[in-house]
Swiss-Prot record:
Cross-referenced InterPro entries: Metalloenz_LuxS/M16 (IPR011249), Pept_M16_N (IPR011765)
Main location class: mitochondrion
Gene3D superfamilies given in the database record: Metalloenzyme, LuxS/M16 peptidase-like
Annotated source species: Mesocricetus auratus (Golden hamster)
Membrane topology term: Peripheral membrane protein
Keywords, in A-Z order: Acetylation, Electron transport, Membrane, Mitochondrion, Mitochondrion inner membrane, Respiratory chain, Transport
Compartment(s) where it occurs, according to its Swiss-Prot or TrEMBL record: Mitochondrion inner membrane
SUPFAM superfamilies: LuxS/MPP-like metallohydrolase
Role, per record: Component of the ubiquinol-cytochrome c oxidoreductase, a multisubunit transmembrane complex that is part of the mitochondrial electron transport chain which drives oxidative phosphorylation.
Entry superkingdom: Eukaryota
Any one GO cellular component localisation term in the record: mitochondrial inner membrane
Residues annotated with N6-acetyllysine modification: 31
Keyword Mitochondrion: yes
Protein name: Cytochrome b-c1 complex subunit 1, mitochondrial
Amino acid sequence: YETEKNNGAGYFLEHLAFKGTKNRPGNALEKHLSSVSRVYEEDAVPGLTPCRNALVSHLDGTTPVCEDIGRRIPLAEWESRYFYDQCPAVAGYGPIEQLPDYNRIRSGMFWLRF
């Protein structure tokens, strides 16, 4: 239902985009705008379209992306698996009077697990 309050240009465009007119279906405006933006992108950034096409052609769908996400190891698990109880390498440059003792640093590696 239409009143004077909602009879603006925005309402008209929304009505045109979603409901269409007698001569054009509801998605005609969307298709036209996407074709215009596609032509603009091809003219403005000539290397973008071949790059995008190459990227899309390498994706076989969502399966590889989901598999990659599923195979990631959480950082806490990774560091506890590989860094726990390892001997650290300590290097000092310049005066080393304030550098803690190596055994103290090594014993502190236990606390990095938690």
